[in-house]
Amino acid sequence: MKKINFSAGPAILPTSVLEQASDAVREFDNGGLSILEISHRSKSFSNVLAETESLVREIAEIGEEYAVLFLSGGASTQFFYTAMNLLNPEETAGFLDTGSWSAKAIKETKLFGKVNVLASSKESNYNHIPKDYNVPEGLKYVHVTSNNTIFGTQLHNWPETSAPLVADMSSDIFSRRIPLEKFGIIYAGAQKNLGPAGVTLVIVRKDLLGTVERALPSMLDYRVHIKGGSTYNTPPVYPIYVMMLTLRWIKEQGGLEAMEKHNEKKAKLLYDEIDRNPKFKGTVTDEESRSLM
């Protein structure tokens, strides 16, 4: 019997995705090998990589001004990766501090440049998303964590700023439509919404790169991975394949509009019961901060 999983960690995957992923472990693409055994330089995997990127672009309506990357290291690696690639020591990044993940990103960013915490809900144990704050001019970018699984909060209004947004969307990527033009970088570990742990989706606006003065290690330079088509080093083949299957499923369900409606309906069922039943007590004090995820 399949369990219902309310964990803040890796989420369940559609049954059809699990079945196809299981078949590929035994033999992939009629090639006599498991997908766990094929070369990342093979035509079979090149086709997987191309389709996965194509689906990401189609579902999220991503233009060619953005690169789509499939990287290792998890979203936590992106906490410093983004700063290394975007922020010079004398420049400042703005942050919304809305939970443990944003706090970790702030810590890592301070290694490479200045940080301006625009607003924080830390003193109230992150039980809401801050609303009344100003974003000064001159920031290199503004970093947000779009959804906070631990605290049950989600950004429903993006910061008003001329600076590009950098967003950790690990736990709500492709759960709703977003104004992509506001974002310079979006990154997300796959295990919440897109597949198993092991691959991180990164969407980066290419014109933002190449502006830092520091020398970057090849493995930590977005431009190297863009040039290498996410194969500069051996990519996480199987997680990317399962991501492809999950993206196919999202497309079949009706894309982001359908996902958004489904999540709104699901969240309403839960919150209605929490509000109605005296045995439950919600931890998010501001209803507008409640997560749909």
Q: Where do the language-model regions lie?
A:
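Conserved PLP-binding catalytic core of the aspartate aminotransferase-like
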Residues: 281-293
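Conserved N-terminal alpha-helix of the aminotransferase class I/II PLP-enzyme fold
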Residues: 32-78, 85, 99-100, 108
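Active-site C-terminal subdomain of aminotransferase-like
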Residues: 14, 190-271, 285
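A glycine-/small-polar-enriched, mobile loop at the entrance of the PLP active site in fold-type I
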Residues: 2-53
